[in-house]
C-alpha cells in the first residue's frame, strides 16, 4: 500500500531552496548541488535505527522527495537508537510517526509511505535517484537490490556491535549484493547495536547519498568497513 503524506507546503515553482535555511551547507557545496538535492527522490527501506537517522539528515538537507518503507511497531529496545521515536510512541506504527516528525522538520519535502515488507510482491517506484538500504536482514536486502531500477544508485549500510559498513552499487553496472555477501549468514537472535555506531554509519550513508546525487560516488563497488574498537577504517573492492 502506498500513501502520500501531505506535509509539503511548497508553492508552485518553489524548489524548497531558501538561502537562509540552507546557508551553512551552501557554503560547502554551493547552489547547484543544493538544487540536485532539492530535486532528488530517495527511497529509504526501513525506518528503524539507520533509516530514522538517514531520513532525518536527508530532510534537514532539503531532499525533494522521500519514499519510506516499513511495517514495524515501536518497542522499548528501539529507543536506544531510533531517533524519531520516544517513550509515548511504544506500540505505535513507525511509518506514520516518522512521516509526521520529518514533516515537522522540513515541510518542503514530499513524503510517500509504503507500508509493508520488501518481498516478491513489492512494487518499486520508478522515479528514484537513489535507494538507501537500512534493512536488518540479508534476504530483504538482496531482494531490494534486485528490484532497484536500472542505473539507480543503491547505498547499503549495515552494523553489528562496534563494526559498520557502507557500500554503493549501481543497478545494471555492479554485481548483485547477493553475490557480494553470498556467504553471509543472518545472526540468530537480536543484533547488538549501540547508538553511537548507528549515527556514524548513517552519517556515512548520507554522505555517500549526497555524493551519488552530485554524480561523484566515492564508494561505488567499494565497501567501507569501520571498527570503533580502534577507529580502524578499511576498504574492500567488490
State what each model feature region is.
Residues 50:
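Hydrophobic/small residue at the entry helix of a nucleotide-binding pocket
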Residues 2-13, 118-238:
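Glycine-rich phosphate/adenylate-binding loop
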Residues 44-47, 68:
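Hydrophobic Val/Ile/Leu positions in short beta-strands of Rossmann-like dinucleotide-binding domains
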Residues 68-105:
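Glycine-rich phosphate-binding loop and adjoining beta1-alpha1-beta2 segment
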Residues 91-128, 134-138:
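A structured beta-alpha segment of the ubiquitous adenosine-cofactor-binding alpha/beta core
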Residues 1-43, 177-179:
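N-terminal charged helix/coil linker that caps or initiates catalytic domains
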Residues 60-65:
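Conserved S-adenosyl-L-methionine
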Amino acid at each position: 500500500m502506498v500513501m502520500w503524506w501531505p506535509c509539503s507546503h511548497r508553492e508552485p515553482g518553489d524548489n524548497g531552496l531558501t538561502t537562509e535555511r540552507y546557508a551553512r551547507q551552501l557554503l560547502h557545496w554551493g547552489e547547484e548541488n543544493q538544487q540536485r538535492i532539492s530535486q532528488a527522490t530517495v527511497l529509504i527501506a526501513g525506518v528503524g535505527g539507520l533509516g530514522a537517522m538517514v531520513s532525518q539528515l536527508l530532510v534537514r538537507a532539503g531532499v525533494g522527495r522521500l519514499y519510506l518503507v516499513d511495517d514495524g511497531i515501536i518497542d522499548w529496545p528501539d529507543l536506544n537508537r531510533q531517533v524519531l521515536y520516544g517513550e509515548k510512541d511504544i506500540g505505535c506504527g513507525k511509518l506514520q510517526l516518522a512521516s509526521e516528525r520529518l514533516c515537522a522538520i522540513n515541510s518542503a519535502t514530499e513524503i510517500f509511505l509504503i507500508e509493508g515488507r520488501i518481498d516478491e510482491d513489492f512494487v518499486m517506484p520508478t522515479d528514484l535517484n537513489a535507494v538507501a538500504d537500512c534493512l536488518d536482514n540479508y534476504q530483504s536486502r538482496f531482494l531490494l537490490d534486485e528490484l532497484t531500477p536500472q542505473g539507480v544508485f543503491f547505498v547499503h549500510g549495515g552494523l553489528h556491535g562496534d563494526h559498520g559498513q557502507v557500500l554503493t552499487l549501481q543497478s545494471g553496472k555492479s554485481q548483485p549484493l547477493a553475490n557480494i555477501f553470498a556467504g553471509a549468514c543472518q545472526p540468530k537472535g537480536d543484533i547488538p547495536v549501540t547508538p553511537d555506531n548507528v549515527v556514524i554509519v548513517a552519517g556515512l550513508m548520507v554522505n555517500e547519498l549526497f555524493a551519488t546525487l552530485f554524480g561523484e560516488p566515492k564508494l561505488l563497488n567499494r565497501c567501507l568497513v569501520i571498527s570503533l574498537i580502534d577507529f580502524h577504517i578499511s576498504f574492500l573492492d567488490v
